Amino acid sequence: MENEILHSERLLLRRWEESDAEELFKIASDPDVGPRAGWETHRSVEESREVIRRIFSNDATWAIVCKETKLIVGCIGYFTHATSNIPIGESDCEVGYWVAKPFWNQGICTEALRLLLHHCLCVKHFQEIWADHFIGNPASARVLEKCGFRDTGLLNRCSHLLGGDKDMVRVMRLETHGKTF
């Protein structure tokens, strides 16, 4: 697994480590966080450790770390054609992210997503980048719009996500013409 670290003025995106389990549990046990992103709140440090092992330990997922405090504040990554929630092309990816509640409305998701988009376009050379968000999460829609995503008009059900069998997700696509990240 590559150990790429991406960084901006305030943030560091780095690979997850099993030693992050306690920090992950602190932010992923908040009932206001997981369901907005389609997963259940974590119930134990061991569950968080297992999520790091089974889900986050790959070349496409990063911990979002605040440079100033060195605290993990969220998670960001991309999914390829084989693992995407939505039907995308083989040379496309879908991005996803979440941030702990104390860090909402601070521009952290937008800053982290811009880092990831640069990586996806300039390093991984994906052709198109897609995203989706629950209709009931307008803050996520605003993050995507700030980064250049536009509504495709498509709605989707993601029954494997918590709430995805009853709540629709809006599918958005990145408009890359003339954009730099």
What would you call each of these model-derived segments?
Residues 37-41, 61-66:
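A short, aromatic/hydrophobic, helix- or strand-capping loop or linear motif
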